[in-house]
């Protein structure tokens, strides 16, 4: 991929669509609750079940289908996501919705892992960072425009209609992949459990996985509560909150884009160190300037940009350490992202109950310092 071609554009569009299927309920939980006659807290379980499917179901799925050629498996998982979306639209009660969301978390995130490994396989090594950044750009755009747009559309469309639109886009992408996606080298990409387990004995890989878990614990500890954090400290900011959320979305988009170029220029390991330092510095500034409304907003934007700058390095690192021969390790990395998020948000909830929402800064600051330590050890031991 010497330049973003049609294949990469379709992958990026699918990244947008699948991010929307994951996040869409977050923007309209209140409306979903009304339509299903349940509480907002209960409707939040639709996201929780999706995360559990992603965390635990993806590695198991890749093991069960390890003999299927990668591009065929990718199409199967996309087709399964289309079917689960139809099931979601026609579900008759809340329990059915929860089951379908669990299955959707498995199929959509299995597709995501296979998409990443396919993109990296199709890209020269010196452009893998930029290709991956272009792919992830789809999910960051979902945060910038997709979720706010969904909220606006919910005034005239119910949530099922929104999923009809997303499913139509998935169907078009599947048709394109069926016609144009090249087959992968089956011998190079099939899952060999004995060889896969060897990666768990590799210190460099384990440190990468530890970095992933730690980073997303800190990320979700703060980001999950970023909106109530700002509103509680600065109630006067509420009329501008939608604009601030757009700013946060743009920060994620920009950080991801810069991260791809920097990764190709200096390598993923140095980029991970740079990202950890930037996250730590941003958190320190958020803490120091906590009484200042606009400086708090500014440094939260800087922190989010540095987090998204770092995020794509993790998949690039796993791919390069395993010579892009392990979709299974990419799925483990994805599972740790989901688990880290769940642990971080839960830890933040405990901290908020014990000492107030302003204290969540300390959770993310500590995890950022831990990232620096992990990466120092990794770069010294495995130069």
Residue ranges: model-predicted function:
Residues 84, 95-103, 294-302:
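Paired small-residue
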Residues 100-138:
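Cytoplasmic helix-loop-helix junction between adjacent transmembrane helices
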Residues 37, 69, 90-96, 289-290:
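Helix-breaking motifs and short loop linkers at transmembrane-helix boundaries and internal kinks
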Residues 57-69, 255-267, 352:
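Helix-to-loop junctions at the C-terminal end of transmembrane segments
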Residues 96, 125-127, 133-179, 225, ...:
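Helix-loop-helix hairpin linking two adjacent transmembrane segments in secondary transporters
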Residues 56-92:
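Conserved MFS/SLC helix-loop-helix module at the cytosolic interface between two early adjacent transmembrane helices
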Residues 269-314:
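C-terminal transmembrane helical hairpin of 12-TM major facilitator-type secondary transporters
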Residues 320-356, 364:
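A late C-terminal transmembrane helix in Major Facilitator Superfamily
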